[in-house]
Amino acid sequence: MTRRLLLLLCLALPRLAAADPQLIQAVVGHPVVQELMGGCSLRCAFPWETAAILPGKPPVPVYTLDDNDADTAWTDAVVGAKLTFQFPKKLPKELNDTPFYGFDIADGNIKSDSIFKQYGRVKKVRLFYNGRAFADVALADTRRWQEVSFDDIMARQGDIFSMEVLEVYPGAKYPTAAITELILQGAH
């Protein structure tokens, strides 16, 4: 009896550990307009480095996701692509344990209605913190800001927040999806 129970536990535990994380529904907000780009975010506490990792490729820096420009977009999103946000390896002591609690995203290439429809948009992502999956996020197919909130994570130097594209809304012309802006929220 004990061997059977042990065997069942050995078979069941990996499946339980691999269970899908909680699903967060993004909240659709106000329109994205150039005049309102910028403002306070986690960047008020410290900067971070953003990179894209496409399947089978090395990381590539991405500068368009937090450039406060509604006319630029990262246009290489495909299922399996990852975005990584690495916090500085050295932070002043008082900035360790800075609250990080979500992000705002302008999904798609929102430069115009026509361009928005031509590119795909990200439909669902999986969020990771230091390599551990903690949530999936469902995004709406809209040109408006979308807000994603989760329980506070106390960010520390060298930490890495990342997201993997799980699903996309197809574009009419291009096979890839786009993201215009992605702003990490926290610090206060």
PLM regions with names:
Residues 1-4:
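Positively charged n-region of N-terminal signal peptides that target proteins for export
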Residues 7-9:
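Sec-dependent N-terminal signal peptides
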Residues 12-16:
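N-terminal signal peptide c-region/cleavage motif recognized by signal peptidases
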Residues 19-89, 117:
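Disordered, acidic Ser/Thr/Pro-rich linker "stalks" and the adjacent N-terminal cap
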Residues 20, 38, 42, 79-82, ...:
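Trp- and acidic/polar-enriched beta-sheet ligand-binding modules for extracellular glycan
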Residues 48, 100, 122-126:
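Exposed beta-strand and adjacent loop surfaces of beta-rich binding modules
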Residues 83-101, 152-156:
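Extracellular and analogous surface-interaction loops
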Residues 95-117:
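A short beta-strand element within beta-rich, extracytoplasmic domains
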